[in-house]
Amino acid sequence: MYICPVCKDKLKQIENSWRCRNGHCFDIARKGYVNLLTTAKHNPKTAGDNAEMVKARTEFLDKGYYRPLAEKLREVAGEVLKDNDSPVIIDSGCGEGFYTAELAKLGKARIFGIDISKHAVAHCMTRVHLAGITNCQFAAASSFELPFADKSADMVVSVFAPVSNDEYARVLKKGGALIVVSPSPRHLFELKAAVYDEPYENKPNVYGLNKFTLGSEVCFEYSAEIASQADIYSLFMMTPYFYKTSEEGMARLRALDDIEVTCGFMIQTYYKK
């Protein structure tokens, strides 16, 4: 399944490393993931989310606020794959593995999670080990240079992550599915209204997926009460707004102890042409 990020030859696991025929070797980390980022393009030590960001996101997600989304994603993926006895699923930009672990419940599916952050994939391994999940593998890798062979996957899933038209089309089998999850127009609107003078709805993401056709689109929304200042702050840290907000806006955020918000998501299912 894995290919060498240097020469694109097939990788084979030999003891505690992955090797290709051309002599390139990638050791399996103590946590159990493999680093397939090339230093020519990315510094594995600094790429993606740092350990503090991964920890904050993990603590928030593990409180269950986004559990309905994870279950809905598994439901949508399961319906697409219902006639496939042993599907291969790539979770591209898998983060700390919250959604990956839910997808692992799909029968005999084999799940491969990748993220550019080695801190994120290290936590993925911790998550699946604690849950007793055995059908997941994780690698530090880029969504724009996937370490997988051509036409090797039945499905790619991208949840709040970068989307690569060319790479997803390359790794998917003919007719393979791509599920993209993004914020709906009203996602967290109440939180924005509390922080900003003129809140606005989210604009639809445009991905330029000309190698795919859109099969279905679901707007999945529900309300959630965020019942502590720490959770509100952690949630805001997970959004793009965190880095664009003024000191005045951050002061308003820190004054919130409880807020009910709309959790809204667009779940789009595409099929490779």
Regions found by a protein language model. Name each.
Residues 1-46:
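N-terminal auxiliary segments of SAM/dcSAM-dependent transferases
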Residues 43, 48-68:
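Class I SAM-dependent methyltransferase Rossmann-like catalytic core
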Residues 64-85:
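Conserved alpha-helix/loop element of class I SAM-dependent methyltransferases that forms part
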Residues 88-91, 96-145:
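Class I SAM-dependent methyltransferase SAM/SAH-binding core
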Residues 144-155:
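A short acidic, Gly/Pro-enriched loop at the edge of an enzyme's catalytic core
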Residues 165-177:
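A short glycine-rich, Lys/Arg-flanked "PGG" loop and its adjoining helix->strand segment in the class I
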Residues 176-185:
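Conserved beta-strand signature within the Rossmann-like core of class I S-adenosyl-L-methionine
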Residues 220-273:
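Conserved Class I S-adenosyl-L-methionine
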